[in-house]
């Protein structure tokens, strides 16, 4: 279970950090003085969002290893519950980064 906790928390941190940073970048980008700074913050947000997908794939891979065809595992149940939430959150941040 530790693997799943680590990946879950890592994905959560990546999304929180990416969203926070792209929101800051969007607030700063209109200031001529802060354009370069906001661009770096936006790059960081993009990198965190990309890292989310690395952990996402690792999480799916670990779940695939745990499959029991006769019974849903705790990990699968957990993933079903959080997967949609994470995907919606990811898509929202991705739109903000692309809009930036």
What are these regions (language model features)?
Residues 1-100:
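Non-heme di-metal
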